[in-house]
Every structure is written in C-alpha cells, then in structure tokens.
Regions:
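Zn2+-dependent metallopeptidase catalytic core
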Residues: 39-79, 224, 230-235
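Active-site scaffold of zinc-dependent metalloenzymes
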Residues: 26-40, 99-125, 170-174
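The catalytic-center signature of Zn2+-dependent metalloproteases
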Residues: 88-107, 127-186
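Disordered inhibitory propeptide/activation segment of secreted metzincin zinc metalloprotease zymogens
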Residues: 1-50
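Short, well-structured beta-strand/strand-turn elements
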Residues: 63-85, 95-106, 112, 121-122, ...
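Surface-exposed patches in mature extracellular/periplasmic domains of secreted proteins
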Residues: 2-8, 12-17, 68-80, 147-151, ...
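Short pre-active-site segment immediately N-terminal to the catalytic Zn-binding motif
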Residues: 45-53, 114-133, 181
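Acidic, glycine-rich low-complexity segments
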Residues: 22, 152-174, 179, 183-251
Length: 251
C-alpha cells in the first residue's frame, strides 16, 4: 500500500517507466522565457527564470536522485522535448507555493513552477523552499500526495494517518519540520521511485551486510551483490518476509 499511496496503480507506474524507455535518461532545463506551449496559459503569468542559486539547488536534488535510482539527468536547452523537467517561477494564487505536472508525452509533462514568494527565494537546504522544491520534483517524476486517493483505487491508495508524515515521504503535507528541509527523499519516496525507475545498480553493489535495528526504522535497498540481513544482535524475534508487499517487524 505504501507504493499505491505514492504512485497509484501498476498501469500508472508502467506508463511513467515507458516514457523514458530503456535509456533511464530525463532531461532538464531552465528556460529564459516561457515555453511556447505555455505562452497562452497561467504558467506565463509573471514568468521568471531561476537564478543561479535556485539552479544549483535544483541540480543538487537531481544529483541526489541519481545516487538512489537508475535515472540520469542531462541538461538541455530545449523545453519542447518530452521527458524534460522544466524549472521556472511564476505568479500563483496567494496560498500556492508551487505546482508541477506529472510525466506525460505532452511537453507540459514534468514542468515545475515555483511561486514568486519569499519561501522560494533560494530553495536552499534549511529553508522551507528546499522541501517545496523536492516535493515538486517528486510530482514531476510521477509521485502523488499520499493522502489523496488514486482514481479507481479508493482507500488502498492512501497512506494511513500514522504513517503520513514528511519523515516518511516528502510528498506528505503532515509534520513538516526544519529537519526535513533538505534535499533527500524519504524512504517511501525512494521505494516508489525504485518501483518506477529501478535502483542505482552501482550503489551498494558489493556483498553487503545490513544489521537490523530495534530502535529505528529499517529501510534496506541495494543495487547488486549477494547481501545479508543480520538480526543476530537482537534480543527479540524478527518477522521477516522475502516476498513483496509486507511490513516486517521486530518483537
């Protein structure tokens, strides 16, 4: 259910994956003027390019994503191509900090518009703008809000209230604190991105050992190798599944 709460359906995940085919490449651009396909839309209102600091921070998020997924991000000057993240600012409603479009074949897919607002002045780590930025990039890669039902799936596509927090997923609206104002996806976000695009095959590629902790969440992912999950230091039993779709637990 934690995948359904961020992606929706298998069909949705397959659709996003097929957009990039086998290349695992997504392009990104910071246009100096509004893209032609958005010129007559609300996106053009107050259109403002990213400044250098904002560009650096957006690229830093993409670099983080490359470390945990099989995706590669390549700069381009062409916003019209599909599979392209377009970053810009514009004028939005008073209560809106940003919005982004889910991936699709139309060039508008994966476009990200940050509001011209003090929150988004730099989008640097330690500011609320950092969380807003990575949240919108999550949308542009196919992630939804965990509290919103996916069409036709009902409650199975909603994260339980006790798990719906920014500590688990940056796509959440709940329990946001300064500790979450960073360029790192939560463990549920990473699981969802792995499901769509696959893990980075070069990360954790050795024969690794993962020790299970009884005091914190154990989230394990691995790129390759013959790996070991070690619970020998625990004083209580462990319920552990090797099949997908389970929450394992200690005690």
């Amino acid at each position: 259910y934690w995948l359904s709460s961020l992606i929706g359906s298998q069909e949705t995940a397959d659709g996003y994956s097929k957009l990039i085919e086998d290349s695992k490449t997504i392009f990104y651009t910071f246009p100096e003027s509004v893209p032609v396909y958005s010129a007559a839309t609300e996106m053009a209102e107050g259109f403002t390019p990213f400044n250098d600091i904002q560009k650096q921070n957006a690229i830093a998020v993409l670099k983080h994503i490359e470390t945990v997924t099989a995706l590669s991000f390549v700069p381009t000057s062409e916003a019209l191509e599909s599979n392209t993240l377009v970053f810009a600012l514009n004028t939005q409603e008073e209560d809106s900090y940003a919005y982004a479009y889910l991936p699709e074949i139309h060039p508008l897919g994966s476009d990200i518009y940050m509001a011209i607002h003090p929150t988004n002045e730099t989008m640097s780590v330690g500011t609320e703008g950092a969380l807003t930025l990575i949240h919108e990039i999550g949308h542009a890669l196919g992630l939804k809000h965990p509290h919103e039902e996916a069409e036709g799936l009902g409650e199975v596509s909603v994260l339980p209230a006790d798990e719906d927090s920014v500590a688990n997923t940056v796509m959440s609206y709940e329990e946001s604190t300064v500790e979450n104002f960073k360029f790192e996806f939560g463990h549920l976000d990473i699981a969802a991105l792995h499901y769509i695009y696959g893990p980075n095959p070069n990360a954790r590629a050795s024969d690794d050992t993962y020790e299970i902790s009884s005091t914190q969440t154990n989230f394990i992912w691995d790129g390759a190798g013959v790996d070991t999950v070690d619970a020998s230091k625990l004083e209580t039993g462990v319920t552990f599944h090797l099949t997908p779709g389970h929450h394992d637990f200690v005690g």
